[in-house]
């Protein structure tokens, strides 16, 4: 069964695939798989190598590369889920690569229904690095993961024995938001403040100030590029403006598929 799935994944030109039994998946913050998919037995995890767009000094080009990857991965997720249903008679559900995710007091909108990092580690696709991303043995942390939940019973792939992360510390030192200063933990709020300046917090600050100033100042505010960036973010969705912890990582920089 695994080999049939691997061959299908290869035809989609996905870079890697791993399998994890539901019992081997453990996430400290995401809800139990049973609450999402009663009867889920396995997770099929797909790995995609980032384009070199993430190296661009132009944040918009870097983010465009990520958006291209996300669009491609959504299509692949759906195609593989359909393949599992039609070829194996299985039930299958796709997991969001990013949004939508639960919005509630407990998670503060920063926790996905399935932790793709923990799923990838359980599926033998890498191990956690100093930047708290999963480092793939070939592609390093320049890897995006997606997943499909299924009721097929598929045994887990062997875990990565030797962590690809070299613990060089470049990601910790290079984080402009100082979000990685505490070992083993990412300060999400510090990361978001730097990484997503035109997200929800940026919009709250803008409109809070907008309501307090004069009509003349309001006109100036909506003519400022800051407002245009907020408008663009509201139109196309969350945008990342920092890829530092990926860019400085030496693991997999010259890897090929």
Predicted features along the sequence, with ranges:
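Catalytic cores of enzyme domains
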Residues: 68-257
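Non-catalytic, usually N-terminal nucleic-acid engagement modules in DNA/RNA processing proteins
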Residues: 1-75
């Amino acid at each position: 069964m695994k080999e049939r799935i691997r061959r299908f994944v290869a035809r989609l030109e996905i870079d890697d695939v791993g399998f994890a039994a539901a019992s081997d998946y453990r996430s400290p913050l995401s809800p139990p798989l049973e609450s999402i998919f009663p009867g889920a037995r396995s997770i099929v995890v797909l790995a995609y190598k980032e384009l070199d767009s993430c190296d661009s000094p132009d944040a918009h080009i870097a983010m465009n590369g990520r958006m291209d990857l996300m669009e491609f991965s959504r299509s692949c997720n759906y195609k593989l889920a359909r393949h599992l249903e039609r070829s194996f008679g299985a039930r299958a559900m796709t997991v969001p690569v990013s949004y939508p995710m639960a919005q509630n007091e407990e998670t503060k909108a920063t926790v996905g229904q399935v932790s793709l990092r923990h799923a990838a580690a359980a599926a033998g696709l890498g191990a956690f690095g100093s930047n708290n991303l999963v480092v793939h043995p070939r592609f390093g942390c320049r890897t995006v993961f997606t997943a499909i939940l299924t009721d097929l019973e598929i045994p887990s792939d062997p875990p990565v024995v030797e962590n690809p992360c070299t613990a060089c510390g470049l990601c910790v030192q290079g984080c402009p938001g100082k979000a990685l200063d505490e070992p083993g933990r990412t300060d999400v709020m510090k990361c978001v403040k730097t990484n997503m300046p035109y997200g929800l917090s940026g919009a709250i600050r803008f409109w809070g100030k907008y309501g307090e100033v004069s009509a003349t100042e309001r006109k100036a505010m909506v003519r400022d590029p800051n407002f245009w960036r907020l408008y663009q973010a509201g139109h196309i969705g969350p945008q990342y403006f920092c890829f530092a912890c990926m860019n400085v990582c030496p693991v997999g920089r010259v890897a090929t598929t």
